[in-house]
Amino acid sequence: MSSHSQEPVGEENFDDSEYDRPNKSQVKREMHALLDLGKELVELSPERLRQLPLEERLYEAIREAQRTTGREGRRRQIHFVGKLMRSAPAEAIRAQLDTWRNGSREETAAMHRLEALRERLLTDDDALTAVLQRNPDADIQHLRALIRAARKEAAANAALSQGQEPQRKQYRALFQALKNLSA
């Protein structure tokens, strides 16, 4: 027998303060999340990338991945981007990406509302009254002229034979005027 005594390793003597690091599966999930975030960044335009809090080395790695055309080379470069993402402010980047995604949904919804308003203006004269009540400083003569021209354009488009391109100039001009009113 040995001269020094060893304490038995049992649950009562187990000190888990030494093992407070995340387990291997958790680390792997985090690395895959960073890799997925890196893949999203590779799909962004250079202008959008410049708006993110990225280190220059990470920015250049992303741009290189965007330029790489070979499948395996691109995969390797994206994995390198994922590795560099470990030191990047991932939460700030995710927050900005979410803002861009949700902001574009809001913009799309606003565009749909304007399109519906334009359709109401073309079919219902009372819709113009509602627009003018919400925007008392709007140029009523200009709006009426645009509505008249868009209605005339729609009537001319209805008379076109199949295969002819319809005119949309006044239709678009009315939309732009409504967009400027809402801005």
UniProtKB/Swiss-Prot annotation:
Q: Name one GO cellular component term.
A: cytosol
Classify the source by domain of life: Bacteria
Residue ranges of region Disordered?
1-27
> Which InterPro entries does this chain map to?
DarP, DarP_sf
NCBIfam families xrefs: PRK05255.1-1
- Role: Member of a network of 50S ribosomal subunit biogenesis factors which assembles along the 30S-50S interface, preventing incorrect 23S rRNA structures from forming. Promotes peptidyl transferase center (PTC) maturation.
Q: What is this protein called?
A: Dual-action ribosomal maturation protein DarP
Organism of origin: Bordetella pertussis (strain Tohama I / ATCC BAA-589 / NCTC 13251)
Question: Which gene underlies this protein?
Answer: darP
